[in-house]
UniProtKB/Swiss-Prot annotation:
Lineage of source species: Bacteria, Bacillati, Bacillota, Bacilli, Lactobacillales
UniProt key word Transferase: yes
GO biological process: dTDP biosynthetic process; dTTP biosynthetic process; dUDP biosynthetic process
Organism: Limosilactobacillus fermentum (strain NBRC 3956 / LMG 18251)
Family: Belongs to the thymidylate kinase family.
Annotated protein name in UniProt: Thymidylate kinase
Keyword terms, alphabetized: ATP-binding, Kinase, Nucleotide biosynthesis, Nucleotide-binding, Transferase
Highest taxon in the source lineage: Bacteria
Entry GO CC: cytosol
Enzyme class: transferase
């Protein structure tokens, strides 16, 4: 496949949506319709329906493995219907969360095991990993304070988990960053948004010299 695949990861409150919006705008200005933005869970009609079930606060009784399997099922549809066709067409994909989120949230946060969630998702991704993953990292307490202050009206089922849950999520992300240093670039998200965006631009340019050339 001739395209390029960049995923964006991070614990809740890391500012991922704001950063990704700025990066997306800059790359669309440079590359136009060669840029494909997508997200997980979601990215196509079937996967978006699964997303609605997963994030609905009314589904608090959902079993942890049911949750993990639903994320994997949504991801499989995303890979087959959205990601692989875009890569085969030579597009640049910007993906808001991917496999690492399942490993962090279900493997770490839910304590189902990093390796077990990795193995489960091999059926979903069919060998497809990002070329580059931007991991926005910050202290758990800072992230949760941002959520409470900035987007209380859009808090979802996973946002409502305990502080210890979110600590386990962050630790799983840090473990992944150590395990896959050639793919995952950690960016300090505990700084001014403009600085975070600039650091992300620099990380992308370091991997792809033709992007963010000005």
């Amino acid at each position: 496949m001739s395209g390029r695949f960049i995923s964006f990861e991070g614990p809740d409150g890391a500012g991922k949506t704001s950063v990704l919006t700025a990066i997306r705008t800059g790359l669309v200005n440079q590359l136009g319709d060669q840029v494909v933005y997508t997200r997980e869970p979601g990215g196509n009609p079937i996967a978006e329906q699964v997303r609605a079930v997963l994030l609905d606060k009314q589904n608090g009784a959902m079993d942890d493995w049911t949750e993990a399997l639903l994320y994997a099922a949504s991801r499989r549809q995303h890979v087959v219907e959205t990601l692989k066709p875009a890569l085969e067409a030579g597009k640049l994909i910007l993906c808001d969360r991917y496999l690492d989120s399942s490993i962090a949230y279900q493997g770490g946060g839910r304590e189902l095991g990093i390796d077990r969630i990795w193995e489960l998702n091999q059926y979903a991704i069919d060998g497809l990993l990002p070329d580059l993953t931007i991991f926005l990292d910050l202290p758990v307490e800072t992230g949760l304070a941002r959520i409470e202050k900035g987007r209380a009206e859009t808090i979802n089922r996973l946002d409502e988990q305990t502080t210890n849950f979110h600590r386990r999520v962050r630790q799983a992300y840090l473990t992944l960053a150590e395990r896959f240093p050639e793919r995952i670039v950690k960016v300090n998200a505990d700084q001014e948004l403009a600085r975070v965006i600039e650091d992300v631009r620099s990380a992308i340019h370091a991997r792809y010299a033709d992007l963010f050339t000005n």
